[in-house]
């Protein structure tokens, strides 16, 4: 007998697929440490190897686009730390991991801690741009937190002396390597904020390995930099070295020397700017004085030109010239007016309307006479044509034919009878005479035989 509720039955394919999905979704990405064995690299460029410890092993694959980023050549027996995704190869049911990154075991553990702390602080918003404080421009006092015996301090002081010797520098010595270094760096940052002597801080050290720089990946140092009221410039290691302190700081400088250049002014450049500004001011003053002198000369000349005696003489000369022009213009105007009057008189005499009126009256009389004669002739001809037309119409009128004794007979359908075959006995006929109509009934029909014409 079967139970009331049967357990789910998987096919092998479905089982492998279900296990693969569980591994990928539930486990996600993990960090694994172990020893490399059976390392191979076929022509495809992918890496295939086994990762093992004392009691277990797992098959691994690292595809070409991922292993390109590995900075060393994996060796048999090497201890490594890998970041990988767990999966299942369904056709064979083999459990394996797909490696995304690989590091030697020592640095790998530190890198894992680095990534975890970075993700944590980033999630809290310590890296957000909105919290970055602007650097003072220019800085009036610079604080340096680093080792008092390190090369970084020497580089910073050398750059500041070269660029801006007058800029005050306060050194807050702290260890930058070792177990006590994070605590000393935090206390130096807090001390600088308590004393409030400087308006920008440089926190850093020279280059080194990941372990050497690890103090600047400490969470306490990161939070001290974030809470500092004084803007902080991080200057840790070389340009390729990136620490947690770099993400939290208000500005990251690739090297300690670069940090010193960022917070200082170039004295030589400032001197060149002052000299350039002085030259521009001198040129501006020269131009201003020349412009004022030219303006003064123009005004002085205008005042001389506007002297009352000179103005009176010029106006008197202008008045005499205007009087001459007025007299000449008046004479010309009178002369032109007289000539125009003569021309108008001649034109008026030539355009006397009386002769034209007489000729027009004569022409009108002639046209009236010709019009009357033409109308009489046309009327007489029209009357004659009308009389002829009336006579012709009376001659061809049906009424005239009826008056001569003829008649017109129509059948009941209104058609005029021309032949006897159009009617039948008993039908009613209507006959039109000159003075009225007659209705009659057909009693008998007698066709008339046509006479044959003799042919000669």
UniProtKB/Swiss-Prot annotation:
Predicted to have 4 domains. The N-terminus (about residues 1-103) binds ssDNA and is required to bind the small subunit; it probably has an OB-fold. The predicted catalytic domain is residues 104-266. Three alpha-helices are predicted in the C-terminal region (residues 267-301, 307-349 and 353-393), their removal singly or in pairs reduces small subunit-binding; none of the deletions have exonuclease activity. The extreme C-terminus (394-456) is required for exonuclease activity. The N-terminus (residues 1-257) at low levels does not confer processing of msDNA and at higher levels is lethal. Changing residue 155 to A: Loss of exonuclease activity, reduced ssDNA-binding. Changing residue 177 to A: Wild-type exonuclease activity. Bidirectionally degrades single-stranded DNA into large acid-insoluble oligonucleotides, which are then degraded further into small acid-soluble oligonucleotides. It can degrade 3' or 5' ss regions extending from the termini of duplex DNA molecules and displaced ss regions. It can also excise thymine dimers in vitro. ssDNA-binding requires both subunits. Required for production of the mature 5'-end of retron Ec78 or Ec83 msDNA. One of its GO terms (molecular function) is exodeoxyribonuclease VII activity. Changing residue 241 to A: Loss of exonuclease activity, still binds ssDNA. It catalyses: Exonucleolytic cleavage in either 5'- to 3'- or 3'- to 5'-direction to yield nucleoside 5'-phosphates. This is Exodeoxyribonuclease 7 large subunit. Its EC number is 3.1.11.6. Keywords: Cytoplasm, DNA-binding, Exonuclease, Hydrolase, Nuclease. It is found in: Cytoplasm. Optimum pH is 7.8 to 7.9. Belongs to the XseA family. Disruption phenotype: No longer processes msDNA correctly (when retron Ec78 or Ec83 are expressed in the strain). Residues 1-103 are annotated as: Binds ssDNA, also required to bind the small subunit. Its main location: cytoplasm. Heterooligomer composed of two different subunits with an approximate ratio of 4:1 for small to large subunit. Also estimated to have a 6:1 ration for small to large subunits. Changing residue 255 to A: Wild-type exonuclease activity. It comes from Escherichia coli (strain K12). Does not require a metal cofactor.
């Amino acid at each position: 007998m079967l139970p009331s509720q049967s357990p789910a039955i998987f096919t092998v394919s479905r089982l492998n697929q279900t296990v693969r999905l569980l591994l990928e979704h539930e486990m996600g990405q993990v960090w694994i440490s172990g020893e490399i064995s059976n390392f191979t690299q076929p022509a495809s460029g992918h890496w295939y190897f086994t990762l093992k410890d004392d009691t277990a092993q797992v098959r691994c694959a690292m595809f070409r686009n991922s292993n390109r980023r590995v900075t060393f050549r994996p060796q048999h027996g090497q201890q490594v730390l890998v970041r990988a995704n767990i999966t299942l190869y369904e056709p064979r049911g083999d459990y394996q991991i797909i490696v995304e990154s690989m590091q030697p075991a020592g640095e790998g553990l530190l890198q894992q801690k680095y990534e975890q702390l970075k993700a944590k602080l980033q999630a809290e918003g310590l890296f957000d741009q909105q919290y970055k404080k602007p650097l003072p421009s220019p800085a009036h006092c610079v604080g340096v937190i680093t080792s008092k015996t390190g090369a970084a301090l020497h580089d910073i002081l050398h750059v500041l002396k070269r660029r801006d010797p007058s800029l005050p520098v306060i050194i807050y010595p702290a260890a930058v390597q070792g177990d006590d270094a994070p605590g000393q760096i935090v206390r130096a940052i807090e001390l600088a904020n308590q004393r409030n002597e400087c308006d920008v801080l440089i926190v850093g050290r020279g280059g080194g390995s990941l372990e050497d720089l690890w103090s600047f990946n400490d969470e306490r140092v990161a939070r001290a930099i974030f809470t500092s009221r004084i803007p902080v410039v991080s200057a840790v290691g070389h340009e390729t070295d990136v620490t947690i302190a770099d993400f939290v700081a208000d500005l990251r400088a690739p090297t300690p020397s670069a940090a010193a250049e960022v917070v200082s002014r170039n004295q030589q450049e400032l001197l060149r700017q002052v000299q350039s500004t002085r030259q521009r001011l001198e040129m501006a003053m020269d131009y201003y004085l020349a412009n004022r002198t030219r303006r003064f000369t123009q005004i002085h000349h205008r005042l001389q030109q506007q002297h009352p005696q000179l103005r009176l003489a010029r106006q008197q000369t202008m008045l005499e010239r205007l009087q001459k022009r007025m007299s000449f213009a008046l004479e010309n105007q009178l002369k032109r007016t007289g000539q125009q009057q003569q021309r108008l008189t001649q034109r008026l005499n030539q355009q006397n309307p009386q002769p034209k009126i007489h000729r027009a009256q004569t022409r009108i009389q002639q046209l009236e006479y010709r019009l009357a004669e033409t109308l009489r002739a046309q009327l007489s001809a029209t009357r004659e044509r009308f009389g002829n037309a009336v006579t012709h119409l009376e001659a061809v009128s049906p009424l005239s034919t009826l008056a001569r004794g003829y008649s017109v007979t129509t059948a009941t359908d209104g058609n005029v009878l021309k032949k006897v075959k159009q009617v039948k006995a008993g039908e009613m006929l209507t006959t039109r005479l000159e003075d009225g109509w007659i209705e009659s009934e057909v009693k008998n029909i007698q066709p008339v035989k046509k006479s044959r014409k003799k042919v000669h």
